[in-house]
UniProtKB/Swiss-Prot annotation:
Domain spans labelled Ubiquitin-like: 1-76
GO-annotated molecular function: protein-folding chaperone binding
Keyword annotations of the record: Cytoplasm, Transport
Name of one Pfam family that matches: Tugs
Gene: ubl4aa
Protein name: Ubiquitin-like protein 4A-A
Role: Component of the BAT3 complex, a multiprotein complex involved in the post-translational delivery of tail-anchored (TA) membrane proteins to the endoplasmic reticulum membrane. TA membrane proteins, also named type II transmembrane proteins, contain a single C-terminal transmembrane region.
Length: 154
């Protein structure tokens, strides 16, 4: 199938792939055509960021789909998940969770529970769309704004 990749500013390109290709492979093809290093690419489909390790079929991307390309400046960290997993605050949360789980479960069960929680957390982050992130940021940055729906906070 042929996908169209459109940078926010610049000329689009087409890449020939199968639905079983990984997003990282698409980035390599785009890198060859547009001379943008794969490490600086962030591909979006219908507003959602695509994770390198996932296949196109995981996102139901079909023939003649159009992907948007955001080019990150060199040296910038990759995505929300990359920043969150390397953050000491998140590391501290996982350490605290490990301590709490150890009090209530056997070591093997605690490890299984924590592993599943980490997977669920990372999956949830990957599924956030740019719209979701903008809404969340707006609510966190302007919690007292009138006209803003805060019923979810109850």
């Amino acid at each position: 199938m042929i996908l169209t990749v459109k940078p926010l500013q610049g000329k689009e390109c087409n890449v020939q792939v199968t639905e079983d290709e990984k997003v990282s492979t698409v980035k390599e093809l785009v890198s060859e055509r547009l001379n943008i290093p794969a490490s600086q690419q962030r591909l979006l489909y219908k507003g959602k960021a695509l994770a390198d390790e996932h296949r196109l079929s995981d996102y139901s991307i079909g023939p003649e789909a159009k992907l948007n390309l955001v080019v990150r400046p060199a040296g910038e960290r990759s995505g929300v998940a990359g920043m969150a997993s390397s953050s000491s605050a998140v590391g501290g949360v996982w350490q605290t969770l490990s301590t709490v789980l150890a009090k209530h479960f056997s070591p093997a069960d605690a490890a299984k529970v924590q592993e599943q929680l980490v997977k669920d957390y990372e999956r949830s982050l990957r599924q956030l769309s740019m719209d979701d992130i903008e809404r969340l940021a707006g609510r966190l940055l302007h919690p007292d704004s009138e006209g803003m729906d805060t019923s979810y906070m109850d």
